[in-house]
Every structure is written in C-alpha cells, then in structure tokens.
Amino acid sequence: VSFLLSPSAQPPPSPRPSPPPALWTPGDRPPDGYALLFPGTGASGGPGLGALAGSGPAAHRIVTDVLDAVQEGLPRDWPSLRRVLLDDPASYRAAARTPGVAQLADYATSVAVDRVLRAAGATPGFAVGQSFGEIATLVSAGVFTIADGARMAVDAVGVLARHGRGGGMALLQTAEPRAQALIDRAGASGEVVVACVNAPELTVVSGPDDPLERVVDTARADGARATRLAVPYLSHHPAMAAAGDEWYAMVRDVPRRPLQLPVYSPVRGRAYTDGDDLPRALADCMAHPLRLPPILRAVHDAGATAFVEAAQGDTLCQCVRLTLPKARTWAPLHQAPRGARPRAAGPGPSNGRDAAASPQPPAAPTADT
C-alpha cells in the first residue's frame, strides 16, 4: 500500500544514467536548514542500516538505540529488528514474511538516519512525510516517541490488511490531468482514482483490480508508460475511509508533544500546526490523495537549503529533482552496486552531480509483503 508500500515506486529506468551511488560517511553532512524527506515504506528492497551503523561507533550506538526503541513498540512475537537488520541481515528476507516487518524496518531506518545526521551536527529546518512516512516525520519533529510511532505503524498494518485487499496501485508516467482522462476513457471513473502525484509527470492511481487493469491497458494503448505496482491493497482511495476511521480510533489518544520542526504534509497540502489533530491527519492518508510537487516547492520557497532522504535509496530525491531540477539533494543511504567502492555524498545536487543530468526515476521495487 502506498501507506505501507511506497507509491514513490517508479517505472524501469531509461537509458540515461542514474545519479552516482553513495553511502554516508562520518563528517559528511548537508548544510543546516535542510528538509528531511520521509518516504512511504516497503519499497527500499531490504535493510540498509548496516552501512549506517558501520560508519562509526557513535552511529552504531544511535542505530542500536533506535532499534531497541522501535522493538519496544512491537508485539512480543515479532522478530528482533536488531538481529535481522544488523546482526544477521541474511535473515531479513525470511523475517519480512511477517506482515509489517518490512514497513517497521523502513520506519526504523528513517528515524536512525535522522538521528545520526543530527548527532553529526547537521540541523534540519523542515520535514516532509510521504504517506506512511508521515509517522516517522512526526517522530522526527518530536511529536511522538519512537516506540509510540512503532505501535501506530503496527496498528496501521493490521487495519490495512483487514480493509484494503482486492485492489492495488499503478504508476502512470504522465501528469495528473492526463491520468484522470485515461481513467475516464477506461470507464473506471469512481472506481479508480488519482492517489499520489509524486512529480509533474509521475502519477499513481489506485482502485479495484479489474478496473485498475483497464486503466493500465488504456494508458499503454495511448502511449503512456504504465506500471502495476506490487501493492496488494487500495490506498489513498475513498473506499479506505472506514479503515482510516478505525485506525484513528486506535491512535487518537497516543501522547503527543508540540512540534519542534516545521512538518509539511502532501495530503493536507500545507504545514501542520500544533492546533491540528495530527492522528486524524495521519489517518486521512489512507483515503485522501497526496500531491508532492507543491509541497516540495513550498518547502524550497520557505528556505530549505537542500533535500535529504531519511531512508535507504533516493526515491524522493529523484522526485525532488524532477520537480526542482536545481535543488540540492542528498541520499545518505543510496546503496552502491555490488563491488563498487562507496563514495561520500557530496554537497551538490544529486550527491555532487548536476541534478539536470539525471532526472529519470529509478526502477520500480518489488513488494516486501
């Protein structure tokens, strides 16, 4: 689900080269005032915390502390995240068969990246959460504890498993107006909806399986690249309103503190305030669409010095570069290919390369659940 399995999944890469891979190294940090990006989870393809924890004793201590705090919020019968992400990463694939493990692994990774960067002296000025990533965003902003965020995520997994089956999501490489026109042409209006706009020419649609397939076929016949995402649920769809209400009832009384960082929501279309019912806002992610480009522009206009992906990979950094070609982006855990020598992320666009040189989206990931 985009709320669980990131709708930022993209179609196969074009022949144009992707940005150079990079891993974070101690002493390498973005300029103060950067915007943290927290993607929807489940699309990273596996654990990436080992590289972060291995970057130095301080980072290792922070990562293990975060994993222990996340574990505190998990059911007792869940696998140990410290074991499957750090001590025995080869066991991760088997552990990820437990519903929600992949999503909580990504949640832990997002929180850990944020904490390690701050410990290195980098001070964020903004945070943007995409779908499920809004939970980690509000943890980063000091609203919820790490353990409470984990509990909320586990509850969301259960609700979506009960309510969201029988549908899915597809990515259309086209702008929102054309995507809506393709839905109409496929005779799927009211069943398939625009769920997520990730970049000016990247639109995710969601709906029941049969009409969703008609939209995909119609898009391809019209010359648009269309990819059915490995997402076994509806998400960002009006049919999930009851699921959102159920989850809200479960999390509405979670203790919260005032925002310590400006948080921008692509679902609400603005920055949150302390007067907002934030659990309600999170629950709305299940049924309401998100539009990322206007939020990225708003954060940029508000003074963000760079955009930093608090996750494994660089999916949202790619969306930034498609929306703001001159923006500076950092992907601390953009994994290097096997056998490649890790390179520190540089301060310039796309880790040191001109952003305009590589605006193409990355390959679509397979689902972890």
Residue ranges with predicted function:
Residues 3-8, 19-182, 225-231, 306-325, ...:
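FabD-like malonyl-/acyl-CoA
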Residues 5-23, 349-367:
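Intrinsically disordered, low-complexity terminal tails and inter-domain linkers enriched
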Residues 165, 196-202, 230-233, 258-259:
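Short Gly/Ser/Thr- and Asp/Glu-enriched loop/turn motifs at secondary-structure junctions
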Residues 175-176, 207-212:
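Helix N-cap motif at beta-to-alpha junctions
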Residues 179-200:
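Gly/Ser-centered flexible loop/linker motifs
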Residues 183-186, 212-222:
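Short amphipathic alpha-helices in soluble, non-transmembrane regions
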Residues 224-310, 314, 318, 352:
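Acyltransferase
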Residues 238-239, 337-345:
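Short, charged, surface-exposed secondary-structure boundary motifs
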